[in-house]
Amino acid sequence: MTLSLHFDKGTIQLHGMAGKYMQHLDGISWDERTNSYRTPAANYRKLVTALCEKNISFQDHARKFSAETFVLKKNIRPRSFQSEAAEAWLSEKHGVVTLPTGAGKTILAVMLIAETGRPTLIHVPTIDLMRQWKEVLSEYFDTPIGLLGGGINDIQTITVATYDSALIHVTHQGNLFGLLVFDECHHLPGEQNQFTALGSIAPFRLGLTATPERADGKEQVLYELCGPLCYEVHIDELSGRTLAPYVVETIEVDMRPEEREQYEISRECYTDFLRKARISFQHPSGWAIFLRRTSESPEGRKAFKAYLLQKKLSQASGAKVDRLWELIQQHKGDRMLVFTQDNEMAYRIGNNFLLPVLTHHTKLPEREAFLKSFRSGEYPILVTSKVLNEGVDVPDANVGMIVSGSGSIREHVQRLGRILRARPGKQAILYELVSKDTGEYFTNQRRRKHRAYEGPVVLPDESGQNSAQIN
């Protein structure tokens, strides 16, 4: 009986004389429920390659896609680094490409989708990104572009899906696509998101991100699901050429006396508890231990409240709001994005200065109106918490102001990337407001070790010019 492969709910079932070949195949296990051998669908490429190399005859009933010819409606003239990235990825047709925001990741994907010639599913984290991808793909491809997400279920040979929607449908659609593209692929190792990759047989996989690093250290999971890092370019390497030249300026702000007094009292309460409980945040489980220990006693709960208060005082001091207003006055005529760590501070700034605020609570019609008005110049300033960290195209912004943020290097590189889309004569500047002599200051120092902060600043001159075979 000939060995046969079948797709079943995000896995590959092996029927026939599978047991005879088990010593030749890795990652295969016996499923007592169905009396068959089974492997995750993501192992399809490795499985088929092994069968071919061992000259084992098989029938492939798993794959429900075939080669496609995608006609481009307009020519692409790639930049040198895009050509290098394409060549690196095409050598194996799987892997992660790291390019800064604004460096043309979407255009690179268009090139590789056309070159690979397989039905393609593009994964994105948000509805906004899903729509932006469809606009670009429709501009280049002479084929309908499908959408999966936001209440839309339209599968085409090229389809854009949110990670959430792709996860829902992967168990029955995981054999329809030969190429998976993961935009903002640092999301992929998430507890749920990774199943969108595990449940698909697609042999060809492209990960795109500006910053593959994760706070939980799960980059290796990303590479296992998507392929190794095959090409990388950093922000500082493209500054003044593909990206606008930029400056990052950290401004240390003295807290108001009453805020400083509250901060010191709260921080002393919080750090005393850490010392008594012998908790170190240098330990990988330090934060989890802190949360557990603070829940076990009144003293612990008091320490946790003190921790939250000292953090809030440093991130959202009134002195920062005063300094922000000075910067806004200084940059009249510029397009500014103001970033905060939380919605409360974003709305506080918006209310104080009568500025539009974008958060995840903003309804879609209002959100689109704000972005349209920002692009037209009617609104020169937008305030946001985390919504604009990734995925929303705001090419006209040239000044970024980080009032508060997390310790994540990725978040800050993403925020820098929001203001770096090039245009003639553009000079970008990113301000980081940091409360002096607080924990926030030391967090900022750790972030600044990233090479985006260390790269040479490229300023424009007066003319505006810059100094196994699977088919």
Task: Locate each region found by the language model.
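Walker A/P-loop
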Residues: 91-116
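Accessory DNA-engaging acidic/polar modules
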Residues: 1-84
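Conserved SF2 helicase motif VI
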Residues: 99, 211-212, 408-429
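A short beta-strand element within the Helicase C-terminal
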Residues: 175-180, 220, 383, 390-406, ...
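Post-DEXD/H (motif II) to motif III coupling segment of the RecA-like Helicase ATP-binding lobe
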Residues: 186-247, 256-261, 265, 272
